[in-house]
Amino acid sequence: MKQTLLVVALAAAASAGAAVTVQAEDGVDKAGATAFDIRMFAGPPGAKAYACFVRRYDANHLAQHPKQKVSAMKLLVTAEDAPEDKTTNYSFRLGVTYRHRSGNFDSSGFCNHAIATDSGHEIRFECGVDCEGGGISVALSKDDKSAIARLSSIRMWNRNKPDDDASEELIAGADDKIFRVDRADTRECAELVTDRKELAALRHK
């Protein structure tokens, strides 16, 4: 199921993926969602848009956060028109490497707009992995130059192993609950994409 993106309930994503208090999609007004999309994708999304965020944690940061398991993170957020449903679908792909083990680990799922009632009612994305795989919450910094990813647990897959052998959980510890990842050229996130047509489109953005 690694490469299959299935729509999941927002409530499940919020409770399993990110420890925040949210209101569901129908509590987000259209103007607010549109404004958030423009911030996220650095302009109106159009038919399809990407936002890439990357962080490689340096030795100084890791020394200050000795319990942090993640040494690097890439986050790709996608918006795509679905004309037949008269709506826009949002999805995410997440890639991490760990500081004390080798390999690249990925996850993916669908997102919805949500209102975080515990932080000034800001709009963010609540994103979930299918089959109760947890998820993440994605907000933006005030200057829109970074994304703030929050999690409590999310299912990850080793990119180079069969699905049955590759699944594991990234569980938020003392230093793995909140990650700031910085906006980057979309080509920085190309390794997260497996579809050839989509990869070509991403590289030409």
Where are these regions (language model features)?
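Bacterial N-terminal signal peptides
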Residues: V7-A16
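Generic structural hydrophobic/aromatic packing signal, biased to beta-strands
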Residues: R55, M73-L75, L94, V138, ...
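Disulfide-bonded cysteine motifs in exported proteins
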Residues: A47-K48, V77, D106, E122, ...
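Surface-exposed, polar helix/loop patches in the mature regions of secreted/periplasmic/lumenal proteins
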Residues: Y98-I154
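Positively charged n-region of N-terminal signal peptides that target proteins for export
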Residues: M1-T4
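N-terminal glycine/threonine-rich, aromatic-flanked beta-hairpin/loop signature
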Residues: Q64-H113, E188
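Short, hydrophobic/aromatic-rich segments at coil-to-beta transitions
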Residues: A47-V54, D85-F92, H121-F125
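Amphipathic/hydrophobic helical signal segments and adjacent flexible N-terminal regions
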Residues: A18-V70, C131-G133, K142-K205
